[in-house]
Amino acid sequence: MSAPSSAAPLSVTITLSGGAALGAFHGGALSALLTGLRAASHEDAVRLDAVGGTSAGAFASILAAHAWLEGIEPVWLMNEAWVERLSVDLLRARAGSAPLSFDRLADRIDRILNPQEEGRDVHRVPRASSPLGLHVGLLNLHGLTFDLAVEGDGQGSTFDDWSQFVLQPGSGSHQLWEPEGSSPMEAVFASAANPGGFAPHRLDRSNHRDHYRENGITSFPDDGVFWYSDGGPLCREPVGRVIDAAERVIDGDERSGSLALVLDPRSEGPTDQAFTGADDVPSWMAGLKRTAGLLPAEAISDDLRRITKYNARIDAVRQVADALADSVDTELLGALIDIVNDTSGEPSSRSDDRLDDDADLTAVLAALTGVHGKKPVSCEVISPRLLDPDANTTQLLAGELLGDFGGFFDQRLRRNDFLLGWACATIWLERRAAIALGLDDQVLTALFDAVEEAAPDEEPDLDVAKASVTSSILPITTAAGRLIASNVAGLLRRTLATR
């Protein structure tokens, strides 16, 4: 395949879904992708501009960003974090205020991020030369109120919130902890605070007060502090917002196009004849499990459909603008610009939707159809179904039991999901890298050589996933016992302290 006609690199973003211990799948997939993209970026063929996600996806994203910007071998970093370290014992709360906590992880995360300071002989790779955007999806427990663009005193509210950052190459792990109270790492902990085990996490949003007000939010607290929980259930536009984070990094630089990669271990679809037919009555537990698996995936599916519609609308705007170019005079164009700017002045509208007085017809039509400032984006999904399109993801993922927390109880499950993620990302690279990334043969060879050299020695064992419930009873029971004992002890200490 020939090289891209434009000398500008392709913009790549990576969006990751939630999934608690299924972050091990993210870790394996990111290891393969970062290894391959780094090889391709050496030839200026691609540019990783942003990563992001919610919950486990947010934590995997910040690890990926650090590895990319600091030149740390991603296979080592992801394996160390997701397979070796992230267990229920590490997440067990100290004070007993909730079953789980990020306190121990916060104390030890720098040992993972800075292996050289621990005297570890970790293979270094060339670090990125350009900044990287980081998007973190959040669930705002207080809620955000805004005025509706209707007559009367109507108000709407949302609990969908987020943080975005621009991280610099070579700045070390310090940038992940600054500013205190609203740093990238603290935002990630807030996003990953699944209510099934973690207490809410607070963030100081004082520095973003003007941003909230510019976007019509009327319920900003005086001290600027909100409490947050796992952002996965309510994140409405995960892919689009990671693309927005990339735009902050690109900031006018040329790109030949845009590719949005989505890592989704829970990428569910219709399977066999399950949940069809009058005679095949599903059990209560089957319905509960199916619903729990579908809810996180639906937000990503909806966003991918939205981007597909935007792509079609962008193309239609271009065609209509070309057809009407000779029919729209300066006076009519000015009137249309005024209409757009009057609409974008509504409290609930984004401040950057306003048009300049010299905007052309294409920009006006784009604003009127909701695609102002947007560019066509290609989307690709990497999921366990790449390994077996006919299989249910529960047959492929080892750590999905116990509401996706099962992997935290058993390292074997995390390891298998890590290997599964690597295998699925490698399959995608083999099938789609040439087309989706627009790489020539020379760059492709460098990419595949790098991935092959970094590949783990093992392959995922699907028997581990199928037998995960029965084979993990002992480690889960043992770890659960320690967790319960720790929380009972914490409860007793608090009870005695109040007497």
Where do the language-model regions lie?
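Catalytic or ion-translocation cores adjacent to nucleophile or general acid/base/metal-coordination motifs
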Residues: A64, P74-W82, G252-T276, L288
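Extended hydrophobic secondary-structure segments that form protein cores and membrane-embedded regions
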Residues: T13-L16, L48-S55, G133-L139, F226-G231, ...
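P-loop NTPase catalytic cores that bind/hydrolyze ATP
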Residues: R127-G143, F226, P233-G240, G257-A260, ...
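Acidic, Ser/Thr-rich peripheral helices and adjacent loops at domain boundaries
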Residues: A274-L361
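Long mid-to-C-terminal assembly/interaction modules of large eukaryotic proteins
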Residues: R354-L355, D360-L368, L402-L419, A423-W428, ...
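Acidic, Ser/Thr-rich low-complexity intrinsically disordered segments
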Residues: I435-R499
